[in-house]
């Protein structure tokens, strides 16, 4: 079974921040699926199951996301992990896909890499870069950024549904957005 993980931070103060685009995409996906909500304490996150995959929003805060991913992956013996995350090295509105590689300094990916290895698939959503990286990723999207955000999330949603039935190379060639 496939595990789709959206990275983000829990708490209302982090809702709609750049670091939470993974959570945002999971929420969009769940709106279009029939899902059962599973235990959240055992897996340190909100876990949902559909006929296509498990969907996880870790509740460990970003730096410990790997604990939640490992708990679900080990318990359900997931043979495929797809992680959705923000990427400051990509311009706002950019959408890219890859397998493995470095964390690029992303603490959520570092945590997953440390506990699960790095051979998982990644859906990278560009949020742009600022001199103060922490304030930038923990900042909310500006009004003028909403159109780009909505566009990339809709494209990523279509890509994810296809990715669950296909491979990342095919999806990348069809759905990547370069900004």
UniProtKB/Swiss-Prot annotation:
InterPro entries per UniProt: Pept_tRNA_hydro (IPR001328), Pept_tRNA_hydro_CS (IPR018171), Pept_tRNA_hydro_sf (IPR036416)
Single Gene Ontology BP annotation: rescue of stalled ribosome
Pfam families recorded: Pept_tRNA_hydro (PF01195)
Binding of tRNA, residues: 14, 61, 63, 107
Site (Stabilizes the basic form of H active site to accept a proton): 86
SUPFAM superfamilies attached to this UniProt entry: Peptidyl-tRNA hydrolase-like
Highest taxon of the lineage: Bacteria
EC number: 3.1.1.29
Signal sequence extent: none
Catalytic residues identified in the record: 19 (proton acceptor)
Keyword match Oxidoreductase: no
Keyword list, A-Z: Cytoplasm, Hydrolase, RNA-binding, tRNA-binding
Site location (Discriminates between blocked and unblocked aminoacyl-tRNA): 9
Family: Belongs to the PTH family.
Protein name (database record): Peptidyl-tRNA hydrolase
């Amino acid at each position: 079974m496939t595990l789709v993980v959206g990275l983000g931070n829990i708490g209302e103060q982090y809702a709609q921040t750049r670091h939470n685009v993974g959570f945002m995409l999971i929420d969009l996906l769940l709106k279009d699926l029939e899902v059962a909500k599973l235990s959240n304490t055992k897996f340190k996150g909100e876990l949902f199951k559909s006929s296509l995959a498990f969907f996880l929003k870790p509740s460990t805060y970003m730096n410990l996301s790997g604990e939640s991913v490992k708990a679900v992956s080990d318990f359900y013996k997931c043979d495929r992990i797809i992680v959705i995350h923000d990427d400051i090295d990509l311009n706002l509105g950019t959408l890219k896909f890859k397998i493995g590689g470095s964390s690029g300094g992303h603490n959520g990916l570092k945590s997953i890499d440390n506990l699960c290895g790095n051979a998982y698939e990644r859906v990278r959503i560009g949020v742009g870069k600022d001199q103060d990286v922490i304030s930038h990723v923990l900042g909310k999207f500006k009004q003028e950024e909403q159109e780009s955000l909505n566009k990339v999330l809709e494209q990523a949603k279509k890509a994810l549904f296809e990715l669950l039935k296909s491979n990342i190379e095919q999806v990348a060639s069809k759905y990547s957005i370069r900004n």
